[in-house]
A protein has these predicted regions:
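Active-site microenvironments in enzyme catalytic cores
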Residues: 20-39, 61-62, 68-282, 297, ...
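Charged, cofactor-coupling segments
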Residues: 21-27, 32, 38-44, 48-62, ...
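A conserved acidic, glycine/proline-rich C-terminal tail/linker
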Residues: 294-332
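Residue-level recognition of short, solvent-exposed, well-ordered loop/turn junctions
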Residues: 124, 131, 309, 333-334
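Sec/Tat signal peptide C-region and signal peptidase I cleavage site
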Residues: 15-19
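Generic structural signal for buried aliphatic residues
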Residues: 196, 314-315, 338
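Bacterial N-terminal signal peptides
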Residues: 4-13
Length: 356
């Protein structure tokens, strides 16, 4: 027995040590954005790190093989599924970001230059696309005659004393991709409205303001294309006042993207600087810190009326500086290019195109 023990000890000493695989953190240490993109004829879900965009399926497979991991979930092939399953797959996305954060380290086949792929609307398509009206006092004020009772009411608006007004856009009919031209309806007055888009992360019904942020997934950019050309109804007729459907819900009237920033990499509260330009000229320059109804109020109010689902989008209102509020009014024409820049998210670009 003593000889056997000595032999085992000797083999233990001379046996080569098994190589230690590197440990890669599954904590959110490397900020990233998410995108839906097209490359090599395939639509993919991407993780954006600076100027690189990683196909999450390919990146996940590479990390699993490198670390010899077992029992890891498959990566989703569309953004809405990713949002629905985020709690389960987030650690694996964090691991991917931490592994590939050094762009100079390698250039795998699943990594692309973000400028050389087709960036699509991040979610095609949410169940609900809901937009708030007049959520900035200065914008609300610019839409009414100076000194008028409606303008005074707008400038005095208080989220604790009244509820907001929302309208719906059809996700399937309205959402278009970044850089996709908006085909202008003939004879209409098309305006610019740059907005922060809030993406819902969990089913939300009758939530409180205290818990509302728990139901948010992240943030993107929405262009609330607005038709000011005769969308109102006669004050003496049936249902007087603005016709929100014709003014806000025209075909392709919701350019969306380019990226989603998960909330763990965004400011809380979500105070973002928004700049809207037409042909490079600044038209709107605002900050979501100036909302009348804040994120918690919007989510609480909407969820008191209907269920919000993962991937649903709330377009949170536009700052002052729209064309209809200028003296004289200004509207877009074919050939114009609208860009909406939100710090920390990106730039949404929409060219205007004449109808054929």
């Amino acid at each position: 027995m003593r000889g056997v023990a000595l032999l085992v000890a000797a083999l233990t000493v001379v046996a080569p040590a098994r190589a230690q695989r590197p440990l890669i953190s599954t904590n959110p240490e490397t900020p990233f954005k998410l995108a839906t993109f097209e490359a090599a004829g395939k639509t993919r879900v991407g993780l954006v790190l600076g100027q690189r965009i990683l196909d999450i399926e390919g990146a996940h497979t590479a990390v699993v093989q490198e670390l010899a991991l077992r029992g890891t979930p498959a990566m989703p092939r569309d953004m809405r599924t990713l949002v629905e399953d985020y709690d389960r797959i987030a650690p694996h996305l964090y691991r991917i970001a931490n592994r590939f954060r050094d762009a100079s380290a390698d250039n795998p086949a699943f990594a692309f230059n973000v400028e050389r792929v087709g960036i699509l609307a991040p979610i095609k398509y949410p169940y609900n696309l809901l937009a708030i009206a007049a959520n900035y006092k200065l914008h609300a004020g610019e839409m009414f005659p100076p000194g008028s009772p409606p303008q005074k009411a707008a400038l005095d608006a208080d989220q604790d004393k009244e509820n907001p007004v929302f309208f719906a856009k059809s996700p399937r009919s309205c959402i278009i991709d970044p850089n996709e031209p908006y085909v202008m309806p003939p004879g209409r007055n098309i305006d610019w409205e740059g907005e922060l888009a809030i993406v819902i992360g969990k089913p939300a019904l009758n939530v409180t303001e205290a818990t509302a942020h728990d139901y948010v997934f992240g943030y993107s950019i929405m262009y609330d294309v607005s038709d000011r050309g005769g969308s109102g109804r006669p004050l003496t007729g049936m249902f007087p006042g603005p016709n929100w459907f014709s003014g806000k819900s025209r075909d392709k009237a919701a350019p969306f993207g380019p990226f989603i920033v998960p909330k763990e990499f965004a400011p809380n509260p979500p105070h973002f600087h928004i700049v809207t330009k037409v042909n490079g000229t600044v038209k709107q320059d605002g900050n979501t810190a100036n909302w009348i109804w804040n994120e918690a109020h919007m989510v609480r109010y909407l969820s008191s009326i209907l269920t919000l689902y993962p991937g649903d989008v709330i377009s949170s209102g536009t700052p002052d500086g729209v064309g209809a509020g200028r003296k004289p009014p200004e509207f877009l024409k074919p050939g114009d290019v609208v860009t909406i820049e939100i710090e920390g998210i990106g730039t949404l670009r929409t060219p205007m195109k004449a109808a054929q």
